[in-house]
């Protein structure tokens, strides 16, 4: 396979072959080149074109780009643009709109009207109308980041553990219930607003490594694990068009 898709997130590095206008089988690693041993680096694919999207810090992005440049004839870095593949970004300055959010919207274009919720280091929420117009969104801490922040300020509060219950009777469950519940409430409120604003039913798509624990609390949501990579595939297909 000569064309590959690479997504460097804040916490994970994922890649997949480009199959038509979709991502193929996804592989994921802990963060970036510094988190991958020599055997893992040697197993990275090679080919003609690597399409790369990164929201990671330059210290993590640059070594991975250098690694890919040794394996591919071309390495193409994706940037957010005002319009692509029928999606129009609402930001006055599209360069300030995260490329992961941009690609998630490209991946969700066929599901519009849709609310896209990404759960990783951050919780991102974006609304896309049936006409491809982005109606804005929100950014908050994800449940994992909430837990880590609480633990950093109050070490007696564990950074993980516990189950979701509506009214917890121990600290671990209370933390999970509070942080997961806060994320779910923000998603639900945003979905309600989107449906009132657009005047039509709006689908809910959820993606990201932190999404699975929230899915039982969002029964109407569809989980799309490879949404950003699918969006990257859409971008690559559009870029290849004359």
UniProtKB/Swiss-Prot annotation:
A monovalent cation. Ammonium or potassium. Pfam families: Pan_kinase. It catalyses: (R)-pantothenate + ATP = (R)-4'-phosphopantothenate + ADP + H(+). One of its GO terms (cellular component) is cytoplasm. GO terms for biological process: coenzyme A biosynthetic process. It is found in: Cytoplasm. Its main location: cytoplasm. Its EC number is 2.7.1.33. The active site is at residue 100. Keywords: ATP-binding, Coenzyme A biosynthesis, Cytoplasm, Kinase, Nucleotide-binding, Potassium, Transferase. Substrate binds at residues 91, 98-101, 171. GO terms for molecular function: ATP binding; pantothenate kinase activity. Its cofactor is NH4(+); K(+). Pathway: Cofactor biosynthesis; coenzyme A biosynthesis; CoA from (R)-pantothenate: step 1/5. Homodimer. HAMAP family: Pantothen_kinase_3. Catalyzes the phosphorylation of pantothenate (Pan), the first step in CoA biosynthesis. Belongs to the type III pantothenate kinase family. This is Type III pantothenate kinase. The gene is coaX.
């Amino acid at each position: 396979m000569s064309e590959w898709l690479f997504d460097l997130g804040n916490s994970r590095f994922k890649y997949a072959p480009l199959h038509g206008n979709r991502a193929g089988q996804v592989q994921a690693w802990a963060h970036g080149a510094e988190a991958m041993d020599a055997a893992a680096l040697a197993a990275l694919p090679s080919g003609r074109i690597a399409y790369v999207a990164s929201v990671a810090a330059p210290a993590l992005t640059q070594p991975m780009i250098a690694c890919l440049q040794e394996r591919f004839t071309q390495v193409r870095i994706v940037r957010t643009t005002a319009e692509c593949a029928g999606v129009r970004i609402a930001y006055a300055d599209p360069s300030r709109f995260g490329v992961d959010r941009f690609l998630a919207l490209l991946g969700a274009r066929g599901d519009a009207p849709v609310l896209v919720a990404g759960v990783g280091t951050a919780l991102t929420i974006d609304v896309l109308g049936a006409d491809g117009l982005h109606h804005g969104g929100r950014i908050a801490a994800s449940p994992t980041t909430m837990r880590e922040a609480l633990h950093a300020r109050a070490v007696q509060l564990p950074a993980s553990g516990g189950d979701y219950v509506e009214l917890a009777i121990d600290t671990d469950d209370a933390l999970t219930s509070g942080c997961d519940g806060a994320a779910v409430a923000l998603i639900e409120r945003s979905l309600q607003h989107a449906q009132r604003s657009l005047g039509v039913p709006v689908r809910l798509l959820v993606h990201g490594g932190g999404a699975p624990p929230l899915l039982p609390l969002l029964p109407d949501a569809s989980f799309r694990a490879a949404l950003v990579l699918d969006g990257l595939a859409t971008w690559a297909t559009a870029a290849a068009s004359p």
